[in-house]
Design a protein with these regions (language model features):
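C-terminal catalytic "cap/lid" subdomain
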Residues: 1-212, 216-245
Length: 245
């Protein structure tokens, strides 16, 4: 906000790391520093768990079109440049096989699947009660046979109580993690989801649920498999290769 008020040419954010990385280096040893990426991608990464920068800071910079440089306090390295101008097209033409920018993980998630025959009025009552209880839902999946969603584990007991009150049949799983794969370059690219599925199945990692948007794919996996899932996907999309442009 200060950079926007001062009409700054750049906003420099100094941290204890060299820039924004393709994954958490504590989980993936060969995670790479992103040299240049877009506001939207970093916003998505931050919202999905990346800790280096707050999503609101990126939103303000994007609103005023001010590039952000995320750099280390202890190095002269240029770090990560966040701007409207992405190098994704150049990376594609240069043979970079990755259509992803980064991978993050969110833990402490509970998954609910409601198997009762839900009429429209019952669905409406359910979601109204969840809203009244200030329970935020994620990964919502509604079909004719079932309704599924995830919540933070600290609200799972409240959800169970509401479902019990409505006398709904449901299953709950509390030991799950959400893997988020972010990348503007995967928009319209065939085979991305197939690669995700094949990579996880090849490592015998169960996929509990998936959903996607234009720039993000979310995969729900058992918590105990999350580290192996991130490492396998990071390798499969070649995010471990040094970024040179």
């Amino acid at each position: 906000a200060l950079g926007a008020a001062l009409e700054a040419e750049f906003i420099d954010i100094f941290t204890d790391v060299g820039g924004i990385m393709t994954a958490d280096p504590r989980v993936v040893e060969d995670a790479q520093i992103l040299l240049k990426t877009t506001y939207n991608e970093i916003c998505n990464l931050a919202q999905q768990g990346a800790k280096v920068i707050h999503p609101r800071a990126v939103e303000i910079a994007m609103q005023y079109n001010i590039p952000i440089r995320v750099r280390s306090t202890f190095s002269e390295f240029s770090g990560t440049l966040i701007t409207n101008q992405s190098e994704i097209d150049e990376q594609r033409s240069g043979g970079n096989a990755s259509s992803l920018t980064g991978i993050t993980q969110t833990s402490n998630i509970a998954q609910f699947t409601i198997n009762s025959d839900l009429t429209y009025s019952l669905q409406n009552e359910l979601f109204s009660k969840l809203e009244e209880a200030h329970i935020s839902l994620d990964l919502i999946n509604i079909t004719q046979q079932a309704v599924g969603f995830t919540v933070k584990t600290d609200t799972a007991d409240k959800v169970s109580s509401i479902l019990d009150t409505l006398e709904l049949k449901y299953s709950k799983r509390s030991d799950v993690a959400k893997i988020s794969l972010v990348g503007a370059a995967m928009t319209g690219v065939p085979g991305v989801v197939n690669k995700v599925v094949n990579t996880l199945y090849s490592k015998e990692i169960p996929i509990l649920q998936t959903t996607d948007s234009h720039t993000t794919i979310w995969v729900l996996v058992p918590e105990e498999c999350s580290t192996n899932a991130i490492r396998a996907l990071h390798q499969a999309f070649e995010l471990h290769k040094p970024i040179t442009h």
